[in-house]
Amino acid sequence: MNISILLPTRKRLDLLKKSVQSLIDNARQPDKLQFLFAVDEDDNKTFLYLKQSKYPNQLALQFKPIGYENLHKYNNTLAGYATGKWIMFFNDDAIMKTKNWDDKIMDFEDEFCLLRFKEQTGHPYSIFPCFPQKWFYLLDHISLHGQNDAWLSEIAYMLNIMRDVDISVIHDRADITGNNNDETFRLRKYNEGNPEQKGDLHHIDMVKLRYKDALKINWLLGLMGQPNEFIIKNLENKSDPFILLKEKFDVYKKAGAVGAGKQNARVTDQREIKVSYSNLSKD
């Protein structure tokens, strides 16, 4: 199996069909994809459909509804069933546009990194993260917070292992395109933007947990013959391990910071986190 696709979905069957079909139609080897779906128990329509659908190597799991703020729990569970060399997040409101996108991912097979697709907002995070299966095997989780893309991306920037890849995805989300302003979108809850509040993405406890993940991955990189001193040098020199992320956010801000519904973390130094919305502050 080449790529395992994690796809939590809630009461968006028509969107889900369109999203999955875009991945299949544009893949060179769709038979080497694995589709892993998470469906809430109160979304029987979607689950019944997936019970009879025949997507490549599919598995659908039912969950008690735990909300968007616990998206990581859906994804961490699905990842335990992943058999692909790469694990990838996708959304039911996302459309793959690039032909042979699966080949472009496999081109990175010899490198341990986080892949960042192109999407119309230009957000510095990898909005649809794609990473080696070993990432999950090492940590026994993908994220410990509902903002999965932010969790993974901040680790990747700390280690300088974020890699842009020429794969384009349309994120057809209400605050970006004006489409799909449904209940699923409106009821989303972000635990982000209040770093003094326990459970927030940038509460000190969460920051420390990401550092632990990053240092474990750094250890693995050395074992794999891909030594990486980026984070170690920054910590030893008491310099900013988030400098690469800050530079990306500067570009993002100048471009207009599209997608106001997405809260954007702005890291000021290795110990202090400031958060704003789409109008990122200078400091």
Named regions from a protein language model:
Residues 131-148, 155-165:
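Aromatic-glycine-rich donor-binding/catalytic loop that engages nucleotide-sugar donors
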Residues 65-82:
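Glycine-rich, basic loop-to-helix element that forms the pyrophosphate-binding segment
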Residues 95, 99-133, 164:
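Conserved donor NDP-sugar-binding/catalytic core segment of glycosyltransferases
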Residues 87:
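Short aromatic/hydrophobic "clamp" motif used to bind/position activated sugar donors
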Residues 150-283:
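C-terminal catalytic/acceptor-binding lobe
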Residues 23-65:
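Acidic donor-binding segment of Leloir-type glycosyltransferases
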Residues 2-4, 34:
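Cell-envelope/extracellular polymer assembly enzymes that use nucleotide-activated donors
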Residues 12-27:
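Short, well-formed alpha-helical segments that are part of the catalytic scaffolds
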